[in-house]
Curated annotation (Swiss-Prot):
Function: Probable carboxypeptidase.
Gene Ontology cellular component list: extracellular region; peroxisome; plant-type vacuole
One example of a Gene Ontology biological process annotation: proteolysis
Superkingdom, natural source: Eukaryota
Name of the protein this chain belongs to: Serine carboxypeptidase-like 20
The keyword Lipid metabolism is annotated on this UniProt entry: no
UniProt-annotated glycosylation sites, renumbered to this chain: N111, N146, N249, N405, N463
Active site residues per record: S186, D421, H474
Coiled coil: none
Native species: Arabidopsis thaliana
Length: 497
């Protein structure tokens, strides 16, 4: 080979290399979505933050809003995790503010001041890239110019979220090869497996970009009407909240069926169970309740508008209060049809045990909304923890077959439960995971965090793990942040929990 030829080849190599570098630089996260500062936080973010809208239907002006945090560890290699709060209708910024986001929020010392933000040592962004998505449209900062889009359900939500993911990974192509997981809690027990199934079908059908989907996590999630409905009474008895005598009476009167309360004697005994547990915090029976003083004009404005309208159930108020929760309903949503919201259930009664003042104040501040690239309040309204805009239909049925199909297809699943949650008790999740009939490959045992027993776990064939977190409530990382980060990290790594 002549020297001239070698020089020419070298020039071609350099040109191609430079061109590829330019391609990598240009085909990356949109700089317009970068968050450079947040009022209330002093210092430097430990990793990059992005937020903004993804339009999934231009004709309708249908836009889903996200907040994305790169991993503080190794963003180019660490998994990408989508986080979904439940409801249906609750913003995933609930998880950002109160559970596993990058900041801890300190209440301001002065009225009308913004909360102070401190770095959260147990943020899930320590070990993963994480997307907080307001879904479905009409929730949080997500909106549509066509109000008919606020009439939706399980299947449409899964289709829309899949459309979001495809466009998001096109906007952030550098993460397309990273392992991808879907996670969520409460009614996201429906969102997660239905969306996961959409992703799997899309990949099989050659939809691009292909998502490197590996598995999913569900925390205290609804799954099936019978298993969820029958979980409460055994939980209350096991926790010592009702007497042996009452447990025997209600079991006999209802013939062990607490999913459908039938007959006067069954209803009377079941009401006694509710009377004994009615004053407890349903999200964590060890915690006190936050009680609103009254529905003053200010209180009404601070609550989701959905709380001010509905109430269509024949169940007595104590039963209604137990059935439905912050990331809400337990039994009602697993029946086919419209899912009632808090306002439908409680009428003029305040939501029990919930204090969302920090998130509401922070996310409705004009400077914060500007910093995180949301539409102004004058355009899309106030941010609400749980939206009243939706007419939401449960149309996906039981989640049991979704879980079976996903795990038999080789996808990893972690079903975790705070063991003091009375909203979606661990007894139901334990029962339905067992009902799949998979071989036990890791016998029931304690799992350890910080040299202490953090809960119990049982592993099954086909990549399924059931896990409890000792002392945690409905929103596990809110109560046990260190332990939550531990099991989350181990699961993503594929390590034994």
């Amino acid at each position: 080979m002549s020297i001239i030829t070698m020089v020419w080849l070298m020039k071609v190599f350099v040109f191609v290399t430079l061109l590829s570098l330019v391609f990598v630089i240009t085909e990356s996260a949109p700089e317009s979505a970068l968050i450079t500062k947040l009022p209330g936080f002093e210092g430097t973010f430990p990793s990059k933050h992005y937020s903004g809208y993804v339009t999934i239907d231009k004709e309708h002006g249908k836009n889903l809003w996200y907040y994305f945090i790169e991993s503080e560890k190794n963003p180019s290699k660490d998994p990408v995790v989508l986080w979904l709060n439940g409801g249906p209708g609750c913003s995933s910024m609930d998880g950002f503010v109160y559970e596993h986001g990058p900041f801890n929020f300190e209440l301001p010392k002065k009225n009308n001041s913004l909360p102070l933000l401190h770095l959260n040592p147990y943020s899930w962004s320590k070990v993963s890239n994480i997307i907080y998505l307001d879904s479905p449209v009409g929730v949080g900062f997500s909106y549509s110019n066509n109000k008919s889009d606020y009439i939706t359900g399980d299947i449409k939500t899964a289709v829309d979220s899949h459309a979001f993911l495809l466009k998001w990974f096109q906007m952030f192509p550098e993460f397309q090869s990273n392992p991808f997981f879907i996670s969520g809690e409460s009614y996201a027990g429906v969102y997660v497996p239905t969306l996961a199934s959409e992703v799997v079908i899309g990949n099989k059908n050659g939809v691009k970009p292909a998502l490197n989907f590996k598995g999913y996590l569900v925390g205290n999630g609804v799954a099936d009407p019978k298993f969820d409905g029958n979980a409460f009474v055994p939980f209350a008895h096991g926790m010592g909240l009702i007497s042996d005598e009452l447990f025997e009476n209600v079991t006999k009167a209802c013939k062990g069926n607490f999913y459908e309360i039938e007959g006067l004697e069954c209803e009377e005994q079941y009401t006694k169970v509710n009377d004994d547990t009615n004053q407890l915090n349903i999200y964590n029976i060890l915690e006190p309740c936050y009680h609103g003083t009254s529905l003053s004009a200010f209180d009404i404005r601070s609550l989701p508008s959905s709380l001010l309208q509905l109430g269509k159930t024949e169940k007595r108020l104590p039963i209604r209060k137990r059935m439905f929760g912050r990331a809400w309903p337990v039994r009602a949503p697993v029946h086919p049809g419209i899912v009632p919201s808090w306002s439908q259930l409680l009428a003029d009664v305040t939501v029990p045990c919930i204090d969302d003042r920090v998130a509401t104040a922070w996310l409705n501040d004009p400077e914060i909304r500007k910093a995180i690239h949301t539409k102004e309040e004058s355009e899309i309204g106030r941010w609400e923890l749980c939206s009243g805009k939706l007419s939401f239909y449960h149309d996906a049925g039981s989640m049991i077959d979704f879980h079976r199909n996903l795990t038999l297809s080789g996808y990893r699943a972690l079903i975790y439960s705070g063991d003091h949650d009375m909203c979606v008790p661990f007894t139901g999740s334990e029962a339905w995971t067992k009902s799949l009939g998979y071989k036990v490959i890791d016998e029931w045992r304690a799992w350890i965090s910080n040299d202490q027993v953090a809960g119990y776990t049982q592993g099954y064939a086909n990549n399924l793990t059931f896990l409890t977190i000792k002392g945690a409530g409905h929103t596990v990382p809110e109560y046990k942040p260190r332990e939550a980060l531990d099991f989350y990290s181990r699961f993503l790594e594929g390590s034994k929990i």
